[in-house]
Amino acid sequence: FLFVGDL
């Protein structure tokens, strides 16, 4: 998880 869309 680095970004919101990386979930």
From Swiss-Prot:
The keyword Electron transport does not apply. The keyword tRNA processing does not apply. Its main location: secreted. It is found in: Secreted. One of its GO terms (cellular component) is extracellular region. Glycosylated. It comes from the Eukaryota. GO terms for molecular function: acid phosphatase activity. It catalyses: a phosphate monoester + H2O = an alcohol + phosphate. Its EC number is 3.1.3.2. Keywords: Glycoprotein, Hydrolase, Secreted. Monomer. Belongs to the metallophosphoesterase superfamily. Purple acid phosphatase family. In L.esculentum there are at least two isozymes of purple acid phosphatase. This is Purple acid phosphatase isozyme LeSAP2. It comes from Solanum lycopersicum (Tomato).
